[in-house]
């Protein structure tokens, strides 16, 4: 059997894994949600949930990878006790990875397109209405969207094609270091804009009055959800890099480093965006309109705005591409582990698959805009995003946690032994009851709340049918967890 690839350095593992976690959500959502929920008051709650929720699930995912030395194609098969059906849950992983890439590659293409347009001066002299028109024209042109999505796909599969150490690790190291340097430069520039101090105050000074106004429960749930979704946990994109990790370091310490990097990027994004909005009297928003309409308009009004706009979208391109590369590797490993394929064959086949599968999201903004699967105003990308973010990420996370703690899964003792192999921060034994009961409950609450938020404003029939579907999926997960196989702790193989 061919020897498993390994990272060339510890830094490579940390930067590649952090690159997977760091995505566009760090930029187009975190600063806005921090500001409206009381600044530093929200950040404090967010950090608590990162440690209590995101970190242990990430440790579970990495540990399954390192313990099995396999991607999700065979990881659960390798570690599960005989007679159990945990391995069937691997399809959550591969389905989630493909579904995510069906729209994320398109959004990555948007970033590359905007970096190109900023660099070539497309936005120079345009007002907000004209910039909005540029974005609208891009969305209505399927040829443009397809071309830039393919550029993102080619770059990402190109990195994966050279293997772990010579391709993914080398390329992602360069991108992540450049990303961090670009962020610092952009944040320093924002800090010296007029009225920047007011923006920083809005962003960071604790405002418990805003928390009370928005509702403490709403603020807590917003912090909980952001902490959960920011780390890209649940579909195996972290697990695959755990399978390439040696046993010199304990996994908890490595996961802490990745969480810290992700948090740093999220916080720095606020230092870039919020002062810019305050400097030009614009309400800080979130989502695509912030990135593709508001910010290009503001860069036009800024001294050296064309340069800063170009640097910003290069930074955003790196954030998107680092995630795409990581998820592509998880997809490739699935085919290599399951089918025994070589890397080149896996790259070739999946290049075609991803390119074709990205077309519905692209056409959903133009040719197929009449298809509105989640109600009026929605599009195909919204549906794909909902299936990933509100379904497969929480359900996949639930599988990882239950598999690691239940006796008819891998078992907590086996999980703990593998997680604590090496030097560094130990994963505590006393956390067992929390992992078995409270953590799964929190994930279930996040999962069901996502459905409630999506469909509570729809018709009663739509709301009831989708909520029943959500509960049915939970029964499937817990059915495998509780009733599958013999009650015998799995062994590390």
Region roles according to the model:
Residues 1-28, 57-62, 66-91, 246-250, ...:
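Membrane-interface "cap" regions at the ends of multi-pass membrane proteins
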Residues 2-7, 169, 173-321, 325-326, ...:
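Membrane-embedded translocation segments of transport machinery
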Residues 3-5, 33-37, 67-92, 105-165, ...:
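Inter-helical loop and helix-membrane interface segments of multi-pass membrane transporters/permeases
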Residues 6, 12-14, 20, 142, ...:
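Loop-to-transmembrane helix boundary motifs in multi-pass membrane proteins
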Residues 6-17, 42-45, 85-98, 146-152, ...:
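Select transmembrane alpha-helical segments in multipass membrane proteins
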Residues 11-49, 236-242, 252-256, 260-261, ...:
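Transmembrane helix-boundary motif of multi-pass solute transporters/channels
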Residues 33-37, 85-101, 136-140, 150-175, ...:
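Membrane-water interface regions at transmembrane-helix termini and the short interhelical loops
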Residues 89-92, 96, 340-351, 387-447, ...:
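C-terminal membrane-solvent junction of multi-pass transporters and transport-like membrane proteins
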């Amino acid at each position: 059997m061919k020897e498993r690839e390994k990272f060339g350095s510890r830094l490579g593992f940390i930067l590649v894994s952090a690159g997977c976690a760091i995505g566009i959500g760090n930029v187009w959502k975190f600063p806005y949600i921090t500001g409206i929920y009381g600044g530093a008051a929200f950040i404090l709650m967010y950090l608590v949930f990162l440690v209590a929720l995101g970190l242990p699930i990430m440790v579970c995912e990495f540990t399954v990878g390192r313990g099995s030395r396999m991607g999700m194609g065979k990881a659960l098969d390798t570690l599960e006790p005989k007679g159990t059906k945990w391995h069937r849950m691997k399809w959550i992983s591969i389905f989630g990875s493909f579904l995510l890439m069906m729209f994320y590659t398109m959004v990555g293409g948007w970033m590359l397109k905007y970096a190109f347009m900023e660099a070539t001066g497309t936005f120079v002299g345009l007002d907000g209405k004209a910039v909005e028109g540029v974005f609208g024209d891009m969305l209505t042109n399927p040829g443009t969207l397809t071309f830039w999505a393919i550029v993102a796909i080619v770059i990402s599969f190109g990195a994966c094609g050279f293997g772990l150490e010579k391709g993914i690790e080398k390329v992602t190291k360069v991108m992540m270091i450049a990303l961090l340097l670009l962020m610092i430069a952009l944040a320093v520039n924002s800090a010296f804009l007029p009225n920047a101090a007011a923006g920083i105050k809005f962003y960071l000074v604790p405002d418990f009055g805003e928390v009370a106004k928005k509702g403490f429960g709403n603020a807590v749930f917003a912090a909980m959800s952001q902490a959960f979704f920011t780390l890209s946990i649940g579909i195996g994109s972290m697990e695959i890099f755990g399978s390439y990790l040696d046993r010199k370091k304990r996994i908890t310490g490595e996961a802490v480093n990745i969480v810290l990097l992700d948090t740093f990027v999220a916080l720095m994004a606020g230092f870039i965006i919020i002062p810019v909005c305050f400097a030009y009297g614009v309400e800080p928003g979130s989502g695509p309109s912030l990135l593709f309409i508001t910010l290009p308009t503001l860069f036009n009004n800024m001294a050296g705005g064309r340069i800063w706009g170009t640097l910003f979208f290069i930074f955003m391109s790196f954030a998107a591409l680092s995630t795409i590369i990581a998820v592509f590797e998880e997809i490739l490993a699935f085919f290599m582990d399951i089918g025994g394929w070589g890397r080149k064959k896996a790259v070739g086949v999946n290049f075609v698959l991803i390119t074709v599968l990205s077309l519905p999201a692209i056409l959903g903004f133009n040719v197929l805009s009449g298809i509105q699967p989640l109600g009026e105003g929605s599009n195909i990308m919204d549906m794909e995003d909902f299936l990933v973010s509100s379904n497969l990420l929480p359900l996949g996370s639930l599988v990882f946690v239950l598999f690691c703690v239940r006796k008819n899964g891998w078992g907590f003792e086996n999980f703990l032994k593998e997680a604590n192999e090496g030097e560094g921060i130990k994963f505590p034994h006393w956390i067992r009851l929390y992992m078995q009961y409270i953590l799964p409950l929190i994930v279930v609450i996040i999962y069901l709340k996502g459905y409630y938020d999506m469909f509570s404003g729809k018709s009663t029939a739509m709301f009831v049918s989708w909520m029943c579907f959500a509960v049915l999926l939970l029964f499937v997960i817990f059915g495998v967890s509780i009733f599958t196989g013999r009650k015998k702790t799995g062994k590390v193989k």
